[in-house]
Design a protein with these regions (language model features):
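Entry/N-cap segments of selected transmembrane alpha helices
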Residues: 101-128, 198-207, 340-370, 397, ...
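Functional cores that coordinate and move charged inorganic groups
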Residues: 159-271
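C-terminal ends of transmembrane helices
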Residues: 12-16, 92-108, 156-167, 210-221, ...
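Hydrophobic transmembrane alpha-helices of secondary-active transporters
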Residues: 69-71, 80-104, 320-343, 361, ...
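Structural signature of hydrophobic alpha-helical transmembrane segments
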Residues: 51, 80-91, 139-153, 194-207, ...
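Hydrophobic core segments of alpha-helical transmembrane domains in multi-pass membrane transport
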Residues: 28-41, 90-96, 126-128, 208-213, ...
Length: 456
């Protein structure tokens, strides 16, 4: 019995360590991509995979006249539910991270923010220009936003493998750059990949957001008062023509960061509860009894309310986004049915797809690191920003190469940019190949440039 308990505990410990490892999210994403590609291309599973993605979803209510569509009369499929529904939570988490970085993190002051923000800007402009140089005037031109994004899960995951080789300042730089890059990608989606906007629905959504803002200002900290209007705002965005995922980012900006209780109140109240707990009568084998449980619940509630709602939600949602939502998104979108080797000829130009593969591949592999590096170099040389402490130009370029891992956000933009399924599929193949090449290049360069530093 003891041996079984010990093995069970060790299994739980290994599982917890895996979930907490910075590279685990990237590994799960990679597995999801591999499974999706296999299911989409194996003869026995290809049809079933496509049928699964195209299952219609509708929330319905039963009225006097029978069943009627309530929420999704536009014929929402399982795949679009993942893209328009589940990904809202992903963007909500990104919004919380951006807000945290702006308020208390690496983007909280001009001095801290200038280098990663300029690097992110360069890492978006140069890939877009490279893509546009291949596709200007073609049917593939709208895809210029695809190679401008960085997948933070993969980039940070790979960098964490070299924890003893890379200066901590460069890890902070890449994290801040990825957050700024996400903000840029969100703006690109909002400005260039929306549909015709229904101004009435948008106005109603804005009024509700103003109400959420005032809830924040008056100090309301009960999550239900934010959750219900947030769902309404998402629905209004969904029907308004603005991509519904952006509602997650907007709502995140109004979630309060300030805790309900001050440090002094928390310390005083917790001290009183601890004293009351110790004074409560208790036999040696009777802990916790009902009275103890009351005090423990009070202490737990006090500790929870002494952490801002924004931080609590970020901590709560992060594992679900990393290990559930993003893998589902990858599973639903990375499964490209390859019925011809033509799909792998990403440098081939066709009248139907333009040079979409060439633009994406070189935008990620060349444009991203070049843009990040040149913007950083100019910022440091003109004394607008300071070089990350302990970092050299070679290592900064190696880390910049990891910025070419687009994947999640790039695939998301790919699905928005094109209506033609063939162009979307070719774009996904190019994203996977460009991201893989960027990951390999960044890994090799980090290994080469940091090799001498490992000798102690």
């Amino acid at each position: 019995m003891y041996r079984w308990v010990r093995q069970h505990y060790q299994f739980q410990l290994r599982g917890r360590r895996f979930l907490e490892a910075p590279w685990s999210g990237g590994l799960v994403l990679l597995i999801s991509v591999a499974v999706a590609m296999l299911l989409a291309n194996l003869p026995l599973t290809a049809d079933g995979y496509q049928r699964l993605l195209n299952i219609d979803i509708a929330l319905v209510v039963r009225g006097s006249g029978g069943m009627i569509d309530w929420m999704f009369p536009r014929g929402l499929t399982l795949q679009t539910f993942g893209n328009d529904g589940l990904m809202v939570v992903f963007f909500f988490l990104i919004g919380l991270e951006i807000k945290r970085e702006i308020v208390v993190g690496q983007l909280s002051s001009v001095k801290k923010a200038i280098l990663p923000v300029l690097a992110a800007l360069g890492g978006m402009v140069v890939p877009a220009l490279i893509y546009f140089s291949f596709n200007a005037g073609t049917v593939a031109a709208p895809g210029w936003g695809i190679p401008t994004a960085t997948d933070i899960a993969f980039a940070i995951g790979i960098l964490s493998i070299f924890s003893d080789r890379v200066p901590i300042s460069l890890k902070i730089f890449l994290t801040a750059l990825a957050v700024a890059d996400d903000l840029g990608a969100i703006l690109v989606i909002a400005l260039f990949y929306g549909e015709e906007v229904n101004l009435l629905l948008l106005a109603i959504a804005i009024l509700i957001l103003i109400g959420i803002y005032f809830l924040n200002k008056v100090g309301e900290t009960r999550i239900m008062f934010y959750l219900v209007p947030a769902f309404v705002v998402w629905a209004l965005f969904y029907y308004s023509g603005i991509h519904s995922t952006l509602s997650g980012v907007v709502i995140a900006m109004f979630i309060p960061m300030k805790p309900r209780y001050s440090k002094e109140y928390f310390a005083r109240k917790m001290s009183g509860l601890s004293d009351a707990l110790l004074k409560a009568e208790c036999r040696a084998d009777d802990f916790p009894n009902e009275e103890h449980r009351y005090y423990l619940r009070m202490m737990s509630s006090l500790a929870t309310d002494s952490v801002g709602m924004s931080f609590r939600l970020e901590h709560l949602l992060a594992p679900y986004v990393t290990f559930l939502i993003m893998p589902i998104f990858a599973f639903a979108n990375a499964g490209v049915s390859i019925d011809s080797l033509e799909y792998f000829r990403i440098f081939h130009v066709t009248p139907q797809a333009g040079a979409v593969g060439t633009g994406i591949f070189f935008g990620l592999l060349v444009g991203k690191p070049l843009g990040i590096f040149l913007a950083s170099w100019l910022a440091v040389k003109t004394k607008l920003a300071e070089m990350p402490e302990g970092a050299g130009w070679k290592m900064l370029f190696a880390v910049a190469c990891l910025g070419g891992i687009g994947f999640t956000m790039s695939i998301f933009v790919d699905t928005l940019a094109f209506a033609d399924a063939e162009i979307v599929s070719r774009g996904k193949i190019a994203i996977l190949m460009g991201s893989f090449a960027s990951a390999v290049l960044g890994t090799v360069l980090i290994f080469l440039f940091s090799k001498k530093k490992t000798r102690i």
